[in-house]
């Protein structure tokens, strides 16, 4: 049974690592430019603090997932890993929430505030952001699954 737990945990951590790393890479490489009324502007992820937060959070989650791959269930650090899994789940959930809110404003605009949608002018940027958000959402869901599995492992430590 312990071997099955280790295999499942390793598999889910690898999936999280792939999803979070993909979200980071796709978000960091998102860039497009447009010209409107003879004015040129660049759209990149650094223009929105929410996208920067999203990229940094996913980078942290992928780094932590990589390190956690090498820890054993039998080490005393496993309870710390459990607490860090909770923290990473919350961190990823907050980053996907804030990035989705900004992406929604970018796509639809906000008529009450007078903000126009920008995805019509910079579609490549919006496509990159959408891809990053899909990968980030996958990472958050996978971390939730990993957290539930970790809760089960902590509450039922039987081999």
Swiss-Prot record:
A single Gene Ontology CC annotation of this entry is: plasma membrane
Topological domains on the Extracellular side lie at: 28-50, 108-130
Q: Which InterPro entries match?
A: CASP/CASPL, CASP_dom, CASPL
Q: How does it sit in the membrane?
A: Multi-pass membrane protein
Taken from the record's topology, the Cytoplasmic segments are 1-6, 74-86, 152-159
Q: Which domain of life is it from?
A: Eukaryota
Residue intervals passing through the bilayer: 7-27, 51-73, 87-107, 131-151
Question: Keyword Transcription regulation: yes or no?
Answer: no
Chief location of this protein? membrane
Q: Which residues are glycosylated?
A: 38
Its localization reads: Cell membrane
Pfam family membership, one = CASP_dom
Name the protein family: Belongs to the Casparian strip membrane proteins (CASP) family.
- Subunit structure as annotated in this protein's UniProt entry: Homodimer and heterodimers.
Protein name per its UniProtKB record: CASP-like protein 1C1
């Amino acid at each position: 049974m312990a071997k099955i737990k280790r295999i499942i945990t390793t598999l889910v951590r690898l999936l999280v690592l792939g999803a979070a790393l993909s979200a980071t890479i796709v978000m960091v490489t998102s860039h497009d430019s447009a010209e409107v009324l003879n004015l040129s502007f660049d759209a990149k992820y650094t223009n929105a603090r929410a996208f920067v937060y999203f990229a940094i959070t996913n980078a942290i989650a992928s780094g932590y997932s990589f390190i956690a791959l090498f820890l054993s269930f039998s080490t005393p650090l496993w309870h710390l890993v459990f607490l860090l899994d909770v923290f990473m789940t919350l961190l990823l959930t907050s980053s996907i929430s804030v990035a989705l809110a900004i992406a929604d404003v970018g796509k639809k605009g906000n008529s009450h505030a007078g903000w126009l949608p920008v995805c019509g002018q910079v579609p490549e940027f919006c496509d990159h952001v959408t891809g990053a958000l899909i990968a980030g959402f996958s990472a958050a869901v996978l971390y939730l699954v990993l957290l539930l599995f970790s809760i089960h492992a902590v509450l039922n430590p039987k081999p």
